[in-house]
Structures are given as structure tokens and as C-alpha cells.
Swiss-Prot record:
Protein name, per record: Kynureninase 1
Modified residues (N6-(pyridoxal phosphate)lysine): 296
GO annotation, cellular component aspect: cytoplasm
The organism's place on the tree of life at top rank: Eukaryota
Cofactor requirement: pyridoxal 5'-phosphate
């Protein structure tokens, strides 16, 4: 952590602030401003908050600072702190512009919008909209454009990938490995895939629990590799998260991927919490396949369209379905690298897509896994945010600031020199996210003592602080580098300490 917390943070202002629990709004603002300026000099990225709408900029909350310092308690509005990008990202301001441009195309062009762009509009035709989005998402996941497709939603894409690449043999490889505390939708997807193949999850599903961390289930790389080795002979597929949704742990994707390939086990990564958060190099790492959503760090909007990655070695294009009679050589149809998949017309070659011929020739690459024409409204919303990422220099450029933000937040919460959160309140929570910056993204997960969650969340909301809760006892705090600042981190920690103090008295722990 010392390498991340450079000297600009170790300022007299910070040292004076964190050793005193009494502060006012101007002190908080000064601290956040000075730290931010210092980090810019040290090579940090500029806050891009101006590109985003601020959630509840004047949230109607109790003015706690006024109540504490002056006793006025006049109910004045408080600037809202939004540290919830791991659940739903903020809306980029250009989203409204792009959506209005899409509506203008629809309103004035009708069906011709599929093929004819509106004059002076930057939007592509609807036929090419998904292609443009793929071009923008490819560098974010570290892939070629041909290896990514913008389509469907996360769980649907996981099912589509499993339908193509999970080929169980009850007498050989038939098991699926996943973590014991996987996001429920991933768990449901695996269970139903097994049942779809008339397999019993009790005997064909392996769930990983960390022997060294059974409560939090922080799986070490060694534990995962050992499980793969142990079950390789009977395992057909592995599903793992790039970043674990509950703990915020970033797994060692390249090492685990390489080990699975050594044992000829197909591995799918759920990148819901990794995409737009941590640098990814899916092609270079040799990842088999992956899927993600776009409403968290990618800021596409609630329920927005998802995406998937299929490595080029797994997406070869075969002869057209319906012309098998011309293939005389045995096995020529199953060309190396081709995976049969659930198909639809939008995955068909663009040159013949509208010819209405019942011969399926998939688009080369991941786009050949598409089914129906995608929602252009969704793609327009997503593309607006991806443009902001491109202007910011991509995830790699943002990672430096993200590391500093998260380390700063951790230091304020539990650092030896910080007493913003009182001694009694510190005993009421612990950080379950790995302290190693290389094993986490932007999220810190705080495990509260039992029974405190409801009261703490209520008190945070009163103080105009928005974070995410995961029952029974976890608060997830995610400073997103695109729009969050060091001041946001300070304001959260002050409010969190106060919320814990109220909850402690209320629950009597």
C-alpha cells in the first residue's frame, strides 16, 4: 500500500484531519481537493465527474454536520456521495444526447434507419450499431473486435456459451466447477444446464470453498488450481468470476486460465464486476470465453445489453448449414475450432442476413453467437458511455487513480494513523476485500457485526451517502475512478463512522 499512497496524501492536512473526528464540511472539501490536486501532480487521472449527472446533487437529508457543530439541525440539503458504481453506474450526460439522436432517426427515418444514417448524426445505421459498440468494448476487455459481441444479458450469454461449449460425457468429463458463494444467477445457470443434460447437480456440480477462509470464501489461486487438478479428469467446464461480487476479490485470471487449459477444461469467466473496473487482456491471456453486463462500471443504464467474448480459436466459421451434402470428406463439417451453438438470424453473415435463406453461415467470431436483432436503444446508451471511456484513455489509464482511491478509502477506514471512525465503532466492522491492491478492483466490502446493517444503511442515507448492501451483513463501497473523488471517500468515512455510532446505541451491541 505504501507504493500507492504517495506523499501527496501524506500531507499535514490529512494527518491533522484523520487524527480528529471533529470536522466540518469545509475541512472535508479542502482535504478532498488538496489530495486530488496532489495526485494529479503525481500522475493521477483527472476526475471526469463533469461528464456525468450527479445523483441527487442536493439530496434532501438531515444536515448532520450542522447538527453536530452548531446544533441547528435545519434539514438543509447535503451533497450526495454516490459510491455505488458496482451496482449501477451513473448516467453519462451524453447518453441523453445520443438517445435523442436515436429517437430522431427512428422518428424521421422509420425502418430505413436500419440502412440509412440521419444526416449530421454521429450514430451508425442500426444494422451496424452492434459492430460499433463491439469496436469500443474490445480494448476494454483486451480483445480483437471479432472476439466480442454486444448482445443479450449476462445470464442469457452464460447459457448461450454453456450450450456451445459444455459437452458433458457421463462416463468421462461431465462436472462443472464454480465457487460455493457464486452470484445466485450463476449458480442457477449451472444447475439448470446440468439438469438440461439430465445430470444431477449433487454429483455433477463442484462448489469451491476456501479451507483457509470458509466464512468469507476468499479463494487463493493455489486453492483454485488444486481443485482444477483434482477434478480435471471428470470436469467439462469451469465458471468463475473475474471479481467476486460479494467480497470484491480479483482472481488471477491469466494463471487460472492457463492451468485450466493445461488440463483441457473449458473455462468461462463472469466479468460482471471486472469489465470497466480492472484491466483485462482476454486474448493475450488465452481466455476461452467470457460474459459481462454493462450497467455497473460501464454505465450503460439499468438492465442494459450485455456482451460476450469468444477467443478466436473457438469461433471458426464452418461451411453453411443446409449445404452439408456437398461436403464429401468425413469430418470436414466439424472444422477445427467451430462450436455448434444456439443460432439466430442476427448471428448470420450480414451479406445474406436479409436474403431470408434458411442456410446459416455465422458471422466470423463472437458475433456469430448473436440471436435476434439487439435493442438499438440499449446499444446507443452503452455506446455513449464507451465513448467516455475512450476519451479517458481506457481502463488501463484509469487503473492508477482507482488504486489510489481504494487505498485512500481503506487507509481512512482502518489505517493506524486514522481515527475518523472511533475505536468502539471500528470493532463493529472489518474489511473482507483483500488488502493486496493486485487482488481487488474498486470495491471494498465491509462486514458489519450482526444486526447493524439496516440501521447503518438508514443513517448513511440520512447523510446523503449511497452505497450498496448485500444481506445479511455486508456494505459494498466502490469509488469509481471515472466520476468519484477523494472527497467522496472522506465524506463516506465520516458518515459511516457516525452511522455506526448511532447503530451501536440503537442495537445495543
Amino acid at each position: 500500500m505504501s507504493e500507492i499512497l504517495k506523499s501527496p496524501i501524506q500531507s499535514p492536512l490529512l494527518r491533522g484531519f484523520v487524527t480528529s473526528r471533529r470536522c466540518d464540511a469545509s475541512e472535508i472539501e479542502d482535504l478532498g481537493s488538496n489530495v486530488t490536486k496532489g495526485l494529479r501532480v503525481a500522475g493521477g487521472r483527472r476526475v471526469l465527474r463533469s461528464h456525468f449527472f450527479s445523483y441527487c446533487l442536493t439530496y434532501p437529508a438531515v444536515n448532520v454536520a450542522a447538527t453536530t457543530e452548531t446544533g441547528s439541525g435545519d434539514g438543509a440539503t447535503e451533497k450526495c456521495v454516490y459510491l455505488c458504481g458496482n451496482s449501477l453506474g451513473l448516467q453519462p450526460k451524453r447518453t441523453q444526447t445520443r438517445v435523442n439522436q436515436y429517437l430522431s432517426t427512428w422518428g424521421t427515418q422509420g425502418v430505413q434507419g436500419h440502412f440509412k444514417p440521419l444526416e449530421e448524426s454521429p450514430l451508425p445505421t442500426w444494422l451496424d450499431a452492434d459492430d460499433r459498440a463491439a469496436q469500443l468494448i474490445a480494448p476494454i476487455v483486451g480483445a480483437s473486435k471479432a472476439e466480442v459481441a454486444v448482445m443479450q444479458t449476462l445470464t442469457a450469454n452464460l447459457h448461450l456459451l454453456m450450450s456451445a461449449f459444455y459437452k458433458p460425457d457421463i462416463n468421462g468429463k461431465h462436472k462443472i466447477i464454480l465457487e460455493s458463494k457464486a452470484f445466485p444467477s450463476d449458480h442457477f445457470a449451472v444447475e439448470t444446464q446440468l439438469r438440461h443434460h439430465n445430470l444431477d447437480p449433487a454429483t455433477s456440480m463442484i462448489t469451491l470453498t476456501s479451507p483457509s477462509s470458509p466464512e468469507d470464501n476468499i479463494l487463493t489461486t493455489a486453492e483454485i488450481l488444486s481443485a482444477i487438478t483434482t477434478h480435471a479428469a471428470t470436469t467439462a467446464l469451469i465458471l468463475l468470476p473475474g471479481i467476486q461480487y460479494y467480497t470484491g476479490q480479483l482472481l488471477d485470471i491469466p494463471t487460472i486460465t492457463a492451468h485450466a487449459r493445461t488440463h483441457s477444461v473449458f473455462l468461462i469467466w463472469d466479468l460482471a464486476h471486472a469489465v470497466g473496473n480492472a484491466p483485462l487482456h482476454l486474448h493475450d491471456w488465452g481466455v476461452d470465453a467470457a460474459a459481462w453486463c454493462s450497467y455497473k462500471y460501464l454505465n450503460g443504464g439499468p438492465g442494459c445489453i450485455g456482451g460476450l467474448f469468444v477467443h478466436e480459436r473457438n469461433s471458426a466459421v464452418p461451411p453453411p448449414v443446409g449445404e452439408l451434402e456437398v461436403q464429401q470428406k468425413e469430418g470436414e463439417w466439424e472444422r477445427e475450432g467451430y462450436a455448434n451453438r444456439l443460432a439466430g438470424w442476427w448471428g448470420n453473415d450480414k451479406r445474406t442476413r436479409f436474403a431470408m435463406v434458411n442456410r446459416f453461415r455465422p458471422v466470423p467470431g463472437a458475433a456469430g453467437f448473436q440471436l435476434s436483432n439487439p435493442s438499438i436503444l440499449d446499444i446507443t446508451s452503452l455506446t455513449a458511455s464507451l465513448e467516455v471511456f475512450a476519451e479517458a484513455g481506457g481502463v488501463g489509464a484509469l487503473r492508477g487513480k482507482s488504486l489510489r482511491l481504494t487505498a485512500f478509502l481503506e487507509e481512512l477506514l482502518v489505517g493506524e494513523g486514522s481515527s475518523i471512525v472511533g475505536v468502539e465503532e471500528r470493532a463493529l466492522f472489518r474489511v473482507i476485500t483483500p488488502s493486496d491492491p493486485g487482488q481487488r478492483g474498486a470495491q471494498l466490502s465491509l462486514m458489519l457485526r450482526g444486526g447493524l446493517l439496516e440501521a447503518v444503511m438508514r443513517e448513511l442515507e440520512k447523510r446523503a451517502v449511497i452505497v450498496d448492501e448485500r444481506k445479511p451483513d455486508v456494505i459494498r463501497v466502490a469509488p469509481a475512478p471515472l466520476y468519484n473523488s477523494f472527497e467522496d471517500c472522506v465524506r463516506f468515512v465520516v458518515a459511516f463512522g457516525e452511522a455506526l455510532a448511532v447503530a451501536r446505541k440503537e442495537v445495543a451491541v
